Swiss-Prot record:
EC number of the protein: 7.-.-.-
Enzyme class: translocase
SMART domains hit by this protein: AAA
Top-level taxon in the UniProt lineage: Archaea
UniProt keyword terms in alphabetical order: ATP-binding, Cell membrane, Membrane, Nucleotide-binding, Translocase, Transport
ABC transporter domain boundaries: 7-242
Coiled-coil residues: none
Annotated Gene Ontology cellular component terms: ATP-binding cassette (ABC) transporter complex
Family: Belongs to the ABC transporter superfamily.
Record: residues binding ATP: G40, P41, N42, G43, S44, G45, K46, S47
Cell location: Cell membrane
SUPFAM superfamilies: P-loop containing nucleoside triphosphate hydrolases
Identification of the protein by name: Putative ABC transporter ATP-binding protein MA_0394
């Protein structure tokens, strides 16, 4: 993905008319396709910062740079930035005001003076995308909290923004509703939308975000990757934050010598992977090999001998003796890792689905994304996994079982990438195939 900064701020300061200081000296950067979390307590200035980012408020000091140019607070410039930077408020009722779902989502395109036919096409496409097309004529106040949140998101997505900002997007949602919103955000991110959220949920921010800003007492007191932020005790203390549950569990099992050291797991599958301590062997290594190097297994097949057939997937040099021999950590996996097949529901065919299910090749079936879930529900298919599908699929494959995942759109690439990233980090090889929409064949 091309690195491109869409929005950045330098030394922003904003004070409300009554003299209340909202933020000061705030500098952040938002890049294309990044997932960014602003973490901080209530009253720290997160909501005010969001209103500054799309030009709703104007800072008294500092400036906002939009595509490399200072934001001008005149009609044309504000129109451009508000089309490109959409905000979803914490309370959906503050944002939804039209008599019907359709009219609410159509508000933005109509204000852009789009032709009526184009408005209808965009709104219907967006409502179908978020799984609300069948509710388009309903009054929004008759909807559930999760449905209202989707209406608010749809009203932003229909404008085709580059940046989508969400204030506490998972607050007050039940686990299923929260998972559906998270699926939606991840899919939008696959289309290279920058997603910016505010949250109090440390575990969510740690596992989800690419980059984190800590906003405390109206100032940015720290920024970095989740690994950098949550492994810094001093920064966490200053921000009044605890460490994420995943890290807390890892540290406890590490203290008991039950886990590999110097790892930074972010998910349950990554914690599980730390519980596989390596074996130690001696190998003759050539000059130039250094401690910490990974070895090409093919070059040492003769020395490894039978060990190679026992599922060796990774080697790392721990120490090099003066004799030229090295102590090498050898990581193994047991035979029988399951596979994951992802069926792209953008070309859904019930006959194909029934054939896959009848084959008996799959032990567990999952479904991701609201649109996909509605499709499989309409055909009376009952997936085993509907929440946390990717992590649970990885864990299932590690137990030697095969998984079939139904999903569509950008979630196909998202699932492949997540599983592939796990494989790269862990050294465990899980075969992941996508069912080809054109030929009806699985492709790597």
């Amino acid at each position: 993905m091309e690195k491109m900064t869409i929005l950045e701020t330098t030394d922003l300061k904003y004070t409300y008319p009554d003299g209340t200081l909202a933020i000061e000296d705030v500098s952040i950067s938002i890049e294309k396709g990044k997932k960014i979390a602003l973490v901080g307590p209530n009253g720290s200035g997160k909501s005010t910062l969001f209103l500054l980012l799309n030009g709703t408020l104007k800072p008294q000091e500092g400036e906002i740079i939009f595509h490399g140019k200072p934001l001008l607070y005149e009609k044309a410039s504000l129109r451009d930035v508000r089309k490109s930077v959409g905000i979803v408020f914490q309370n959906s009722d503050d944002q939804i005001f039209a008599p019907t779902v359709y009219q609410d989502v159509a508000f933005g395109p109509i204000n852009l003076e789009m032709p009526e036919e184009e408005v209808a096409a965009k709104v219907n496409e967006t409502l179908e995308y978020v799984g609300l097309l069948e509710l388009k004529d309903k009054p929004p106040h008759h909807l559930s909290g999760g449905q209202k949140k989707k209406v608010a998101i749809a009203g932003v997505v229909v404008m085709e923004p580059e940046v989508i900002i969400l204030d506490e997007p998972l607050t007050s949602l039940d686990p299923v509703g929260a998972d559906e919103i998270l699926d939606l955000l991840n899919e939008l991110n696959q289309f290279e939308k920058a997603i910016v959220i505010s949250t109090h949920d440390i575990d969510f921010a740690y596992s989800w975000a690419d980059y984190i800003y800590l906003l405390v007492n109206r100032k940015i007191i720290g920024s970095g990757t989740p690994e950098e932020i949550f492994r810094d005790p001093g920064m966490l203390k200053d921000a009044g934050l605890r460490i994420p549950m995943v890290l807390e569990i890892y540290y406890e099992i590490q203290k008991r010598n039950m886990a590999s050291v110097n790892r930074v797991p972010k998910t349950v599958p990554e914690i599980v992977d730390t519980l596989k301590p390596p074996s130690l062997i001696w190998l003759d290594v050539p000059e130039g090999v250094k401690e910490g190097d990974k070895l090409d297994l093919g070059l040492y097949a003769e020395q490894l001998g039978e060990i190679c057939s026992e599922g060796v997937v990774d080697t790392r040099v721990l120490h090099i003796h003066e004799s030229g021999q090295a102590i090498v950590a050898v990581k193994r996996i047991r035979a029988g890792i399951g596979r994951v097949l992802i069926y792209d529901t953008d070309n859904y065919k019930l006959k194909e689905i029934k054939g896959l299910l009848a084959s008996g090749d799959f032990d567990v079936v999952g479904a991701m994304g609201k649109k996909t879930k509605l499709i499989v529900e309409s055909d009376n298919l009952k997936p085993d996994l509907t929440v946390g599908v990717i992590d649970k699929s990885i864990l299932t494959a590690l137990c030697g079982k095969n998984v079939l995942i139904f999903t569509g759109g950008g979630m196909v690439d998202h699932a492949v990438r997540r599983i592939s990233d796990y494989c790269k980090k862990s050294g465990v090889r899980i075969n992941v195939d996508v069912f080809n929409r054109e030929t009806g064949e699985a492709q790597d």
